[in-house]
Regions:
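Glycine-/small-residue-enriched transmembrane alpha-helix faces in small-molecule transporters
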Residues: 1-46, 84, 92, 150-177, ...
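C-terminal-most transmembrane helix of multi-pass membrane proteins
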Residues: 2-4, 9, 48-49, 57, ...
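Hydrophobic alpha-helical transmembrane segments of multi-pass integral membrane proteins
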Residues: 12-17, 43-58, 81, 134-138, ...
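Specific transmembrane alpha-helical segments of multi-pass solute transporters/efflux pumps
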Residues: 24, 28-29, 57-109, 145, ...
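Hydrophobic/small/kink-forming positions within alpha-helical transmembrane segments
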Residues: 26, 30, 57, 83, ...
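Helix-helix packing/entry segments at the starts of transmembrane helices
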Residues: 45-47, 105-112, 175-197, 230-266
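C-terminal transmembrane-helix exit sites in multi-pass transporters
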Residues: 55-63, 93, 112-134, 258-278
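Hydrophobic transmembrane alpha-helices of multi-pass small-molecule transport proteins
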Residues: 56, 128-148, 164-168, 198-201, ...
Length: 306
C-alpha cells in the first residue's frame, strides 16, 4: 500500500496532467471556432476524433501488453457510454459555436466545474470535500471575470453550450468512475474517441455534404484539434483522473479558460482587461485551495496511514 507521501506525489502529478489538459484545450478553442468557417461541425468532430483514435490506439495496445491484471468484462460497455457523453458534449459545443462568441462559449462551457459535483451527489450519492463547492464557485467566477465580466445577449448557441457543459460534466464523472476500475486509461481513450469518430462521420455523411476543398482549408484546425486537443488533451485527462476525484479534476480542467486567454495574449496579440487578470488570479486560487485544503483537513489517522 502506498505511503501517505507517495499518495500526495501521485495526486500532484495527476493534477499536473489535468492542468496540461486545460492548457491544450484552451489553445484549441480558437481552432474549433475558425474551423467552422470552412467545414461543418459534424465532419469536424468526426475527423478530429479519427485522428485522436490513431494517436491513442498504439498506446492502448502497449498498455494491453503491459497489463498485469485482467480487465473487467463490462469495461468496454462502460467506455462506450463515456464515448456517447463525449460526442454529445463535442457536438453541442461545436453547434453552439456557429451562433455564439468564443467568449460566451468559453464561459458557459466552464459551467461543468459546478455540474460535476452536482452530478456526483445526484447519481453517486457521494459528497465531495466541502471545499470543492466554494472552489468550484471561485473557478466559475474567475472564468466570468476573465470573459470581461459580462456576456453578450444569450441566444440558441449559448443554450446549446450550457447543454454541452452538462455532457462534459457527465463525461468527467464517468471517467472518474471507470478509469480506476478498468486500469486501462489508454483503451478508454481509444474507445471514446472511436465512438465520436464513427458518430461524427456518420452524421456528417447524412446531414453535411463533404467538400474536400473545405476539409483542406480547415486541415490545420482539424490536425490541431485531433492530435492535441482530442488526442493528447483527453488522454492527459483520463490519466490524471485515475488519482483524483471528479469534482477536483473539474476545477483543474476549468483552467482551459485561463490558458485560452493567456495564449491569446502571447500568440495572437489579444489583451486581457484588469478584471480579466483578477479572474486569472481567482482561478489559480481555486485550484490551490482544491489541492491544499483537503490535505490539511484530512484526519490525522488517515494522513499517518501507510
Amino acid at each position: 500500500m502506498p505511503s501517505h507521501q507517495e499518495r500526495i506525489v501521485t495526486r500532484i502529478q495527476a493534477n499536473l496532467f489535468l492542468l496540461l489538459s486545460g492548457a491544450i484545450w484552451g489553445a484549441g478553442f480558437v481552432a474549433q471556432s475558425t474551423a467552422m468557417d470552412s467545414i461543418g461541425p459534424l465532419w469536424f468532430i468526426g475527423l478530429r476524433f479519427a485522428i485522436a483514435t490513431a494517436v491513442a490506439a498504439p498506446l492502448a495496445l502497449w498498455e494491453h501488453r503491459k497489463a498485469e491484471q485482467p480487465m473487467p468484462k463490462s469495461s468496454i460497455r462502460n467506455f462506450l457510454w463515456i464515448g456517447l457523453a463525449l460526442f454529445a458534449g463535442a457536438m453541442t459545443q461545436q453547434l453552439g459555436l456557429l451562433t455564439t462568441s468564443v467568449t460566451n462559449s468559453g464561459f458557459l462551457t466552464g459551467l461543468y466545474v459546478v455540474f460535476v459535483p452536482m452530478l456526483t451527489v445526484i447519481f453517486l450519492r457521494r459528497k465531495p470535500h466541502w471545499i470543492i463547492w466554494p472552489a468550484a464557485g471561485m473557478a466559475l467566477l474567475g472564468i466570468f471575470l476573465l470573459s470581461g465580466g459580462k456576456l453578450a445577449g444569450l441566444n440558441s448557441g449559448d443554450f446549446l453550450t450550457i447543454v454541452c457543459a452538462v455532457f462534459w460534466a457527465l463525461q468527467v464523472m464517468l471517467v472518474g468512475i471507470f478509469v480506476g476500475r478498468s486500469g486501462r486509461p489508454m483503451l478508454l481513450s481509444t474507445v471514446q474517441f472511436s465512438v465520436c469518430a464513427v458518430l461524427g462521420c456518420a452524421a456528417g455523411a447524412i446531414f453535411e455534404p463533404l467538400d474536400l476543398t473545405a476539409v483542406s482549408n480547415a486541415l490545420p484546425e482539424i490536425l490541431y484539434a485531433g492530435f492535441f486537443s482530442s488526442g493528447i488533451g483527453f488522454i492527459c485527462q483520463v490519466v490524471g483522473q485515475r488519482y483524483t476525484t471528479a469534482p477536483q479534476a473539474a476545477i483543474f480542467l476549468s483552467s482551459e479558460a485561463l490558458f485560452a486567454a493567456l495564449l491569446g495574449v502571447l500568440l495572437l496579440g489579444e489583451t486581457i482587461t484588469p478584471v480579466g487578470y483578477i479572474g486569472c488570479a481567482v482561478i489559480f486560487a481555486a485550484m490551490l485551495i482544491a489541492e491544499i485544503v483537503p490535505e490539511l483537513t484530512k484526519p490525522k489517522s488517515v494522513a499517518a496511514g501507510a
